[in-house]
């Protein structure tokens, strides 16, 4: 009730703001196009900060509203203006399907773009980024802003007038798409001023990535914004960076991007050298293990736990004495992965096999995710299980979660149709409140209580009866399923019954638009996985409203109430009639794993007979509580990931800041002086600080430097300070000699070398961190807090890495010889071969990256492109 009252208070405040905007808008109505453009230029001079933007919100929103009316023939409703205010304030605006989020976003985008630091509109796919930029582009161009679009595969565009001369003429002669004298709320296409529609057409012109980011507004996907950030921190020249900072972003489908994908890091990776035979061997070994005897399955945590018998069996089969010995831990992870592939990951539910490839199915949308792979060798384990070619594992060069990427923005906002159920997570993780924006027309959809059966067989029989009944009266039905397997099972039952229908799942996603367009027509039956939720608009055909509108039938409850609400949201849009009902059984995954006992007791108390469903508000409430419990578990997992990644994020920023310092530095003398000082002082302090000097150990610790650099056998030192000064001066003299030898190219050569050293150490560090994550999860079974353990280990590891970076730089700047332009070009090409992966990531069930750990050279470097270093 308190939250509800708070939402009411916010809306009351917004309503007052809207009335002020309406007053200004009525004054603008009589002004010429050229005057509106002049007012926009004046505003741009006034708005230089978020505080200025707050002050000029009323004029800016009114200007956008009038510009949209004239260029698009669309006037944002008052509720859309409210949504825009919420977005400007850095909140999540919950706006139902069909309520016009795209248009609502133009107002805060314009206002914040006036500041001149760039605004990012984040969408979930390339098509939507292009579509929305083109659709809303005329508004921004009319008001003097530039609009860019970034797409995958390096494609970038600017939105420009299709016919600049005609657009100029339309502005000068005061043309408007909205005809004079039309006073309705919604302008239909046939009533629009055709001449103005033609004049305000826009198109995409290809530009560079950097130019797209220099536009006032940049549309793109969450993946591309994140990948560009990571790529920017791998460049060898500062001018190759494309982003210009993280100022203000609006995330469309915010719940999907910021919550559902929060466990899914963006990863830039390259190939590893793992042998496919290892995965095939363990796929065969896994078949010999008996469930509940050799191992147990934790379905809630999606992991496998070996019993003592299982451990003994594994040691015997693999031929090792102790499976948990540090040298064998990679074998343990291979076995766990193979068992997971066999018992936890199901074909046509979690993945499909197409053209000899294992392709992941998105658990939230049901869409196929080609290119995305499970990490840590799990994908290879599934490939081995299915007998398809095994693709090589990868090495991580750079990674970031969406949680940490989007928290870099000075101001972040989101919009979606379903957010209120996740408000606590939005607040805790991103500091964003959720504001529920009212619909323009009242919602009249009927949401029935759940029907619960004892078995899935009974449930499906009743679902088919319900579909048949509604089909016969001509009412369209959309049936939501949770997997491809279940959508095809239901389809086969309907075929036997002779009920015509269409199927929409990941296997038929190419036909999505066509299938969705028909879903609201009279007599149409559509079976869909969750993919029918996002970015689709189901319009009712003639006569359907009189039959009760589109009927949604849910065949199972999802772990998240939000996904169920998205399915319901397919009907009843913009005041249309509609209804929804969920058919459940005690054998459904959610109820079986988390609540069958409680619901079974209720059914026994009420003496429900076999085949007889129960439908009661109390039961619906009980199921909702089960979902809340599961949401809590999933939030806890995401929170654990975030706490771990927060540690990594501080370290990532430190490394990237060091890279920037090197990229921007005009002269490296001071920087290298600090490094030499660090190398010398740490060793003198360790081996020669007291009375007991250990010169032999000191010599060994400095043995990575060029031979003959130090003469510690002949010299006598009266104090550790004298020893320190001698060592430091020798390093400095040798560096100055090397600098002289390289000549004018020294800065370029040293910069190139230092960046490659940092990148190589950071890459290896990320790999080690993955191993630590896996190890601390195992320790959590021993009652140790995995977060505390992770922090302790990674803080030490990071300090060690920074020490190794300093040692390696100090060593290699004294050994380096001049690098040719050809060498540098080849190194850049090597960098270009890295892969971009939006990798499926599950904190609870990570697995090792290698079957056997190869001994690494102490402080050695794997590769620096073609740079040559004297040994």
Curated annotation (Swiss-Prot):
Signal peptide, first to last residue: none
GO molecular function list: ATP binding; protein-exporting ATPase activity
Q: Which one Pfam family would you cite for this protein?
A: SecA_PP_bind
Could you list this entry's UniProt keywords, alphabetically sorted.
ATP-binding, Cell inner membrane, Cell membrane, Cytoplasm, Membrane, Nucleotide-binding, Protein transport, Translocase, Translocation, Transport
**Keyword hit for Transferase:** no
Broad enzyme group: translocase
What SMART domains does this protein map onto?
Answer: SecA_DEAD, SecA_PP_bind
> What cellular-component terms does GO give this entry?
cell envelope Sec protein transport complex; cytosol; plasma membrane
Query: Known EC number(s)?
Result: 7.4.2.8
Recorded topology in the membrane: Peripheral membrane protein
Q: Where in the cell is the protein located?
A: Cell inner membrane; Cytoplasm
* Chemical reaction(s) catalysed: ATP + H2O + cellular proteinSide 1 = ADP + phosphate + cellular proteinSide 2
**One of the GO biological process terms:** protein transport by the Sec complex
Q: Binding residues for ATP, per the UniProt record?
A: 80, 98-102, 537
Q: Which family is it part of?
A: Belongs to the SecA family.
As for what it does, the entry says:
Part of the Sec protein translocase complex. Interacts with the SecYEG preprotein conducting channel. Has a central role in coupling the hydrolysis of ATP to the transfer of proteins into and across the cell membrane, serving as an ATP-driven molecular motor driving the stepwise translocation of polypeptide chains across the membrane.
Q: How does it assemble?
A: Monomer and homodimer. Part of the essential Sec protein translocation apparatus which comprises SecA, SecYEG and auxiliary proteins SecDF. Other proteins may also be involved.
Q: State the name under which the record lists this protein.
A: Protein translocase subunit SecA
Lineage summary: Bacteria, Thermotogati, Thermotogota, Thermotogae, Thermotogales
């Amino acid at each position: 009730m308190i939250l509800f009252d708070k939402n009411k208070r916010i809306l009351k405040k917004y309503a007052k703001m809207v009335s002020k905007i309406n007053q200004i808008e009525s004054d603008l109505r009589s002004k010429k196009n050229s005057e509106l453009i002049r007012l926009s230029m004046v505003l741009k001079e006034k708005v230089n900060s978020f505080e200025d933007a707050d002050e000029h919100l009323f004029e800016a929103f009114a200007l956008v509203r009038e510009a949209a009316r004239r260029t698009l023939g669309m006037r944002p409703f008052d509720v859309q203006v409210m949504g825009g205010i919420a977005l400007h304030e850095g909140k999540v605006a919950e706006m139902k399907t069909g309520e016009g989020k795209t248009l609502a976003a133009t107002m805060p985008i314009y206002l914040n773009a006036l500041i001149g630091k760039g605004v990012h509109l984040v969408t979930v796919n390339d098509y939507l980024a292009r579509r929305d930029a083109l659709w809303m582009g005329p508004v921004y161009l009319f008001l003097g802003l530039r609009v860019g679009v970034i797409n995958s595969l390096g494609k970038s565009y600017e939105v420009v007038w299709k016919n600049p001369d005609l657009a100029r003429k339309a502005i000068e002669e005061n043309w408007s798409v909205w005809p004079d004298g039309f006073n309705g709320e919604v302008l239909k296409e046939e009533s629009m001023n055709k001449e103005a529609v033609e004049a305000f057409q826009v198109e995409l012109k290809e530009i560079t990535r950097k130019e797209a980011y220099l536009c006032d507004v940049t549309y793109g996907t969450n993946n591309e914004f994140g990948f560009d950030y990571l790529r920017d921190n791998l460049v060898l020249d500062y001018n190759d960076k494309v982003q210009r900072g993280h100022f203000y972003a609006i995330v469309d489908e915010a719940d999907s991007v910021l919550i559902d994908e929060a466990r899914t890091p963006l990863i830039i990776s390259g190939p590893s050298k793992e042998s496919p035979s290892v995965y095939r061997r363990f796929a065969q070994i896994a078949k010999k293990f008996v469930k509940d005897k050799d191992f147990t399955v934790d379905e809630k945590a999606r992991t496998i736990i070996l019993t003592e018998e299982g451990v003994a069996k594994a040691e015997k089969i693999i031929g090792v004495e102790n499976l948990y010995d540090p040298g064998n831990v990679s074998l343990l992870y291979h076995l766990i992965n193979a068992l997971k592939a066999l018992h936890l990951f199901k074909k046509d539910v979690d993945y499909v096999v197409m053209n000899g490839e294992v392709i992941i199915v998105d658990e939230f949308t049901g869409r196929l995710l080609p290119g995305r792979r499970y990490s840590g060798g799990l994908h290879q384990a599934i490939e081995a299980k299915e007998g398809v070619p095994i693709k090589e594992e990868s090495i991580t060069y750079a990674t970031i979660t969406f949680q940490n990427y989007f928290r870099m923005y000075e101001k972040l906002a989101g919009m979606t149709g379903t957010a209120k159920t996740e408000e606590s997570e939005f607040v805790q993780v991103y500091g964003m409140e959720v504001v529920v924006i009212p619909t323009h027309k009242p919602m009249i959809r009927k949401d029935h209580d759940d029907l619960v059966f004892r078995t899935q067989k009974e449930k499906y029989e009743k679902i088919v009866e319900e579909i048949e009944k509604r089909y016969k009266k001509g009412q369209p039905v959309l049936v939501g399923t949770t997997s491809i397997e279940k959508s095809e099972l239901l389809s086969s039952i309907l075929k036997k019954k002779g009920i015509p229908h269409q199927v929409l799942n990941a296997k038929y996603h190419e036909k999505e638009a066509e299938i969705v367009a028909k879903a609201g027509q009279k007599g149409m039956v559509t079976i869909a996985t969750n993919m029918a939720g996002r970015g689709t608009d189901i319009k009712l055909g003639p006569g359907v409203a009189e039959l009760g509108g589109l009927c949604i039938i849910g065949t199972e409850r999802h772990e998240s109430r939000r996904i169920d609400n998205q399915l319901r949201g397919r009907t009843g849009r913009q005041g249309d009639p509609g209804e929804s009902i969920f058919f459940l059984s005690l054998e459904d995954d959610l109820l079986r794993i988390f609540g069958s006992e409680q619901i079974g007791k209720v059914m026994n108390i009420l003496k429900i007979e076999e085949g007889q469903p129960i439908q009661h508000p109390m039961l619906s409430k009980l199921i909702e509580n089960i979902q809340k419990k599961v949401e809590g578990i999933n939030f806890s997992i995401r929170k654990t990931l975030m706490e771990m990644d927060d540690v990594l994020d501080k370290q990532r920023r430190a490394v990237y800041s060091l890279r920037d310092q090197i990229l921007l530095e005009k002269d490296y003398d001071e920087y290298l002086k600090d490094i030499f000082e660090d190398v010398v002082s740490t060793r003198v302090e360790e081996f020669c600080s007291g009375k007991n000097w250990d010169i032999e150990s000191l010599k060994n610790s400095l043995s990575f430097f060029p031979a003959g650099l130090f003469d510690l056998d002949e010299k006598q030192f009266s104090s550790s300070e004298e020893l320190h000064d001698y060592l430091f001066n020798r390093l400095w003299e040798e560096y100055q000699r090397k600098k002289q030898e390289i000549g004018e190219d020294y800065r370029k050569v040293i910069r190139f070398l230092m960046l490659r050293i940092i990148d190589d150490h950071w890459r290896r560090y990320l790999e080690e961190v993955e191993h630590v994550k896996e190890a601390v999860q195992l320790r959590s079974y021993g009652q140790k807090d995995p977060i505390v353990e992770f922090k302790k280990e990674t803080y030490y590891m990071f300090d060690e890495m920074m020490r190794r970076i300093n040692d390696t730089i100090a060593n290699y700047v004294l050994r380096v010889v001049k690098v040719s332009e050809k060498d540098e070009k080849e190194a850049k090409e090597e960098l270009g071969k890295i892969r971009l992966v939006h990798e499926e990531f599950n904190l609870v069930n990570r697995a090792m990256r290698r079957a056997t750990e190869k001994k690494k050279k102490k402080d050695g470097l794997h590769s620096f492109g073609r740079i040559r270093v004297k040994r």
